[in-house]
Amino acid sequence: MEFAGIMHGLGVYVTIFERDDKVLRGFDEDIRDFLVAEMIKKGIKFMPNTHVDRIEQIDAGFTMHTTAGETVTTDLVMYATGCVPNTKNLGLENLGVALDKVSAIIVNKDYKTNVPSIYALSDVTNRVNLTPVATAEGMFLVNKLYANKAGNVDYENIPTAVFSQPSIGTVGLTEAQAREKFSDIDVYKTDFKPMKNTLSGSSERTFMKMLVVRSTDKVVGMHMVGPEAGEIIQGFAVAIRAGATKAIFDNTIGIHPTAAEEFEIGRAHV
């Protein structure tokens, strides 16, 4: 999704083939729908539920053949169908290091493998594959081994961004996860055109969503699609981790004119 936005911004006609009915599996459903709608407005084409059977190189580029019998001719193909831990050719099998079915290194809560002298962390363990998480895991392990400091990395409420165009920022539970975990979820969301887009004539809109446990008033999820979504959600991630309630958000005075203030004043209960 990120490279689709980059290439489109450089003037390339972009078509996204997606095996599922939607892109960005695991993200909040509203976020997935809103992003695709905005990207379509920009001129990016989506082909959901499409499986590529083969890619044929021709004089003018490539022809994509789908299992449904469709063909699409293009200048270039970026083939990105997922990723697996890059643990091949490390000699792990010679050392007896245990791997799971996707070749991720199996570790315990202290990042120790089944071989006592070998530790592993970050993407090769296939847990939360984000750079800041890798940094946190590395610092934890160094402190535990060499500074005798206790503690563990907390994998809940890790903020995440997708630098698509428009970008995504998210922290906490999706609506589906929240409804599975709690019986009383209130949903607040807003869809608006930021002031700078109104003045510039841009049609790009921004979407924000907040999930609240009704019985405790605790905010358990915040999601956004729009300019600087990652920058905005990073700040709110602190509030989520601190256990902020909706009342705290409601009583916080926002900065005007900003998009972020809509998380305080502009949400509609649905």
Predicted segments, located by residue:
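Short, surface-exposed charged micro-motifs
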Residues: R54, G96, D110, K209-L211
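Rossmann-like dinucleotide-binding cores of NAD(P)H-dependent redox enzymes
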Residues: F3-T63, T67, R127-T135, N143-Q177
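FAD-site-proximal beta/loop scaffold in flavoenzymes
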Residues: T71-A147
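A short alpha-helix-loop-beta-strand transition element characteristic
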Residues: A98-K101, N148-N157, D184-Y188
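Flexible, glycine-rich terminal cap/loop adjacent to redox cofactors
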Residues: A147, F163-R267
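Hydrophobic alpha-helical segments, especially N-terminal targeting/anchoring helices
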Residues: F17, H65, L99, V107, ...
